[in-house]
Amino acid sequence: MKVRKKEVEYMNEKIYEFDAEIKKVPDIDGAYVEIPFDVKEEFRKGRVKVHATFDGVDYDGSLVRMKTPCHIIGIRKDIRAAISKQPGDMVHVTVKERA
């Protein structure tokens, strides 16, 4: 009988909090913020599912690299409308890993 070892996935419980400038995605009506820390070091993986807030508005998304020098998280148009902010504005962000 073969016994498989199940890897225990690491889950980071820390809440990260920072202020960031909203950046514009070139050629489309998209926006994102850059993550100001080393995501691979903090979460032990490259793409991370997170629960985030932008000025207190909830969002579930992922920290990703999209041909950018660092990880980013997108800010949907409806969230930008809800917080009345656009590219160039500063936003308060919280990020916590989710399962």
What are these model-derived regions, one by one?
Residues I73:
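Beta-strand/loop nucleic-acid-binding surfaces
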Residues V3-C70, P87-A99:
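Long, compositionally biased stretches
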Residues R76-A81:
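Short alpha-helix capping/helix-loop boundary micro-motifs
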